[in-house]
Amino acid sequence: MWNYLFGGNKQQKKEYPKKAIVELREHIQMLNKKRSHLESQIADQDALARKYITTNKALAKNALKRKKGYEANLMKIENQIDSLETQLTSIEGANLNLETMKAMKQGAQAMKQIHGEYDVDKVENTMDDIREQVELADEISEAISRPVGTEFVDEDELDEELAMLQEEEKEHKQQTPAQKAPVAKVSAPEEEMPDFPTVNKNKPAASTEDDEDEEALKALQAEMGL
């Protein structure tokens, strides 16, 4: 223990809390067994005293004395168990705090290592580089999307050529004679068709003469283009 407090191997210091916890638990377990044994002995002596209380007072008295001795030992054992359990709880809590501190320390070291790779100035420089590259990409995109060849055309020359074309079109219209108004074509009156007797299709043919009249009518219509 003194080596743990004032020096000694680091690995031993690391394992000492765990070892102390294990030993305390084992000792408490042993004391609990001892307490159970004393409680059994107290019960036996109490039963023996009750058995001889009327027939043999000397045996009953000796049994009570042994019972008192066992009860005194039981009280000491229970006090020891209480002390060890209190100490065990404290050590477990301290060990838990130690493990928590170790985890927090490792987390702090990890953050320190991460932040060691960059700082505020490096972040600002990186953001400036990003903005510069974005602007460059926009310029490149604009240059690529610009029509090829149109930048070499003279706008004044185009306006002059357009004015010449308009002047030529104006002169051409002045030189072209006015066209005569179209004369409406008078169509000849259609020749009226003679009235023909209506033929009842549902009525059966009365005679061969009616069939001949029907054939003549069809021939006349075909001749007239109807």
Curated annotation (Swiss-Prot):
Residues 18-177 form a coiled coil. This is Vacuolar-sorting protein SNF7. It comes from the Eukaryota. The keyword Chaperone does not apply. Required for the sorting and concentration of proteins resulting in the entry of these proteins into the invaginating vesicles of the multivesicular body (MVB). Also required for the proteolytic cleavage of the transcription factor RIM101 in response to alkaline ambient pH. Keywords: Coiled coil, Cytoplasm, Endosome, Membrane. Belongs to the SNF7 family. The keyword Nucleotide-binding does not apply. One of its GO terms (biological process) is vesicle budding from membrane. It is a peripheral membrane protein. It comes from Debaryomyces hansenii (strain ATCC 36239 / CBS 767 / BCRC 21394 / JCM 1990 / NBRC 0083 / IGC 2968). Residues 164-226 are annotated as: Disordered. It is found in: Cytoplasm; Endosome membrane. GO terms for cellular component: cytoplasmic side of plasma membrane; ESCRT III complex; multivesicular body. A component of the endosomal sorting required for transport complex III (ESCRT-III). It holds the Pfam family Snf7.
